[in-house]
Design a protein with these regions (language model features):
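N-terminal membrane-targeting hydrophobic helices
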Residues: 1-124
Length: 124
């Protein structure tokens, strides 16, 4: 018998949407120009360049930029040292990761780009 994960999935996506919203608020509250958030946000996906060397190095570079450790450390250090660029960088990562997870894109497994910790994405 299959397990209905519906309610849990809704909660997980709501959590990620909250991370996305937090990143947007941090960006704006710390003087980040709203028109630059999306171009800055896209820079995070440069981490996919590792896939040119194969699925294992690709998953390593992608996951290094798509987990919450870096933005939380940047946010903490930026707040503690009053270093605005660190807070803005954290905001970029938080918005990117929050949106990716809200849409169902997870950390990559070393087997294939479409294999994530949230399940397989795309067709096939």
């Amino acid at each position: 018998m299959g397990v209905n994960r519906g309610a849990v999935d809704v909660i997980l996506r709501a959590e990620q949407a909250a991370i996305l919203a937090t990143g947007i608020v941090l960006w704006i509250a710390n003087g980040g120009p709203p028109p630059l958030l999306i171009p800055a946000w896209l820079l995070v996906d440069l981490s996919m360049v590792g896939y040119l060397a194969g699925p294992l190095p690709g998953s390593i570079t992608y996951n290094a930029a798509h987990n919450l450790v870096l933005p939380v450390v940047l946010l903490g250090l930026g707040w503690w040292t009053d270093t605005g660029w660190m807070v803005l960088a954290a905001a970029v990562f938080l918005t990117h990761i929050g949106l990716d997870r809200t849409l169902g894109y997870g950390l990559k497994l070393p087997t294939d780009f479409r294999d994530t910790h949230l399940g397989r994405i795309g067709k096939g």
